[in-house]
């Protein structure tokens, strides 16, 4: 929660949201759009029938770089990180020092590094934990200025394929970089 004295952070798409008439609300320390002029029901129906773009830039994005990155990251969660193939994505649970669950996260093996996405509400604590526990074994690169978008709906692949045709080859829990 954000105190009145704390200024809300803005995603890279903040100005676009405001220009499109979004109603902005505090969420995870950011000013985030909660709805647009057409209303929630229209937005929901559009997403279910076509595809909608969601700004999830409040979530934490980081890269784990180095030859020991996968082995180091695997010490923080009860999932196989070392064996994750290039272009494959995995859901994981970030554990505290006692083995309790701190948070959940997603990561993908890009071939050069691990790209990690942590939840916005716990971003600072998650990133600090990762840096403190494995920062000496691999480089932890934060990406605070990057936007993160979620494209959802039955027409999502077709919509994105118009910009980056290679995305059609992706299946569930895979990822990749595409030129457009």
Residue ranges and their predicted role:
Residues 1-180:
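Basic, glycine/lysine-rich polyanion-binding surfaces/domains
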